[in-house]
């Protein structure tokens, strides 16, 4: 019984921390600098790999991706997007995650995080970026349901937009502009 209380208390603390992070995103004026997104993504992935040393994930990060933005907020964004890709590819022998840049026909630059993980039903894509909305059970994939809401807020603070595509069992693709 005491163990359940401890776990519940720890989870509540994590949730409060996540909510505080979400609330802070909208307050401070972002400090805009040149951010090497490729290097930042590599740091995030290294941290994920260190936390699960036995796990093998094929990760491809396009070199030379830069953006103007708040480094701390963009780190939070990549921690959430790449962390989700890492989490939702768990259990796959051939887990793959990509972080690339695409230039659309009109010249707009999109940054893309793609994985071959659990994916999601495209009918529920609009719910992905709302706080506390989860498309997978807590038992299957732990989380608070705040990460993608934070990502959306960060993207919007940078004047960008975000969209998601997915297919159950085939993975997810999240694209954003800054």
Outline where the language-model segments fall.
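Short alpha-helical Gxxx[C/S/T] motif in the catalytic ATP-binding
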Residues: 5, 147, 151
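Short alpha-helical segment of the dimerization/phosphotransfer core of two-component systems
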Residues: 7-12
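Short conserved segment of the HATPase_c
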Residues: 120-132
């Amino acid at each position: 019984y005491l163990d359940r209380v401890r776990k519940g208390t720890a989870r509540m603390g994590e949730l409060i921390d996540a909510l505080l992070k979400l609330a802070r995103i909208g307050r401070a004026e972002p400090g805009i600098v040149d951010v090497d997104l490729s290097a930042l993504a590599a740091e995030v992935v290294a941290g994920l790999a260190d936390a699960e040393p036995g796990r093998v994930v094929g990760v491809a990060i396009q070199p030379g991706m830069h953006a103007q933005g708040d480094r701390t907020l963009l780190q939070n964004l990549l921690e959430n997007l790449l962390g989700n890709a890492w989490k939702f590819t768990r259990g796959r022998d051939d887990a793959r995650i990509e972080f690339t840049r695409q230039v659309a026909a009109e010249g707009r630059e999109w940054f893309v995080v793609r994985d071959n993980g659990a994916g999601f039903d495209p009918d529920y894509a609009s719910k992905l970026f709302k706080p506390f909305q989860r498309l997978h059970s807590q038992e299957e994939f732990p989380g608070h349901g705040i990460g993608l809401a934070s990502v959306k807020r960060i993207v919007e603070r940078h004047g960008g937009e975000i969209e998601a595509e997915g297919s159950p069992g085939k993975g997810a693709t999240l694209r954003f502009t800054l």
